Curated annotation (Swiss-Prot):
InterPro entries: DUF1540. This is Uncharacterized protein YtzL.
Length: 52
């Protein structure tokens, strides 16, 4: 099955054409424990900045 994970963080190493995440897996966490009320309470821990 094809993954369709979209990402708009264009300075991430895994960012690809069409805003597609190219990581093999992603790790998303909640700031507030096990649950989140909205997307602002979450973080993508897979983020890896481009080498400058």
């Amino acid at each position: 099955m094809e993954q369709k994970i979209l990402c708009e963080v264009n300075n991430c190493s895994y960012w690809g054409k069409g805003n597609k995440c190219t990581a093999d897996a992603i790790y998303v966490v909640s700031h507030t424990g096990e649950t989140a009320e909205n997307s602002r309470e979450t973080d993508c821990k897979t983020f890896k900045p481009h080498d400058l």
